[in-house]
């Protein structure tokens, strides 16, 4: 089985040096043919080595054995043909968004950030009105919030501030439905099809997909068709997951579905390029126009990323 280290070592090569050699070139995307499909990864994490100290302070344990830096990510994107990516800071780094914002500053065309914010901290409410004034910040990503009412302030505040919200909290579709209905101007994006490793292990995959599909009736809700290789029990092209992807595509349509990888998870399951071709070559029910939306146009439009 290919380890994460082997995957990176075999993929980076000379690309690592080229990613840092010319800052001016890094700021400007390469000229591409007019007909090229724009590929946007709706979820990638970045984590630098210094975060190990932060993890220790917070008493957290990282889920990846090594840092995954900007310098590692850029060559992977270049080789696979990924034009842009939405950085979602990993939950094990606490509520730090600084490294993701650093990536957006260094590569403003290629990266933007969905930042993390502590929902139980009463001081967080004051941050939302000016949240998007941080260069490169597009919105907020939340997961695992409490149902004790301590997070209730967040949804109307995010709606008022015009902040898109990505969320992952499987098994709580009824709660999401109430939020979507009460806040129709709030952009809500379900991460990873509403699935998690724990859901799969518990044998509740079909239930989770059904719940996510049920939210499609709310026009302000959309879904990332992301991380399928991580949950599949098969090798590429992960045909056991094709019916689930099809179910959500039929429910939401191409303009509310987004391709993404969460690339640091599941390196052994697929290369970055295979994660692209899984959608562009193996999902035969998708038209070319569908792929244009799902692979990039839709997430840019939904997040207002120009």
Predicted segments with their positions:
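Active-site glycine-centered loops adjacent to acidic/histidine catalytic or metal-binding residues
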Residues: 262
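Short, solvent-exposed turn/loop segments enriched in Gly/Ser/Thr/Pro and often Arg
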Residues: 88-94, 298
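Histidine-centered divalent metal-coordination motifs
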Residues: 43-49, 192
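Active-site gating/metal-coordination segments in enzymes
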Residues: 83-84, 93-171, 178-180, 222-228, ...
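Short, electropositive alpha-helical surface patch
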Residues: 95-110, 243-250, 275-282
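Mid-to-C-terminal alpha-helical segments outside catalytic/metal-binding sites
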Residues: 2-19, 28-42, 55-84, 247, ...
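Catalytic pocket-lining loop regions of alpha/beta-barrel enzymes
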Residues: 146-258
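Active-site phosphate/pyrophosphate- and oxyanion-stabilizing loops and adjacent acidic/basic residues
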Residues: 74, 101-102, 129, 177, ...
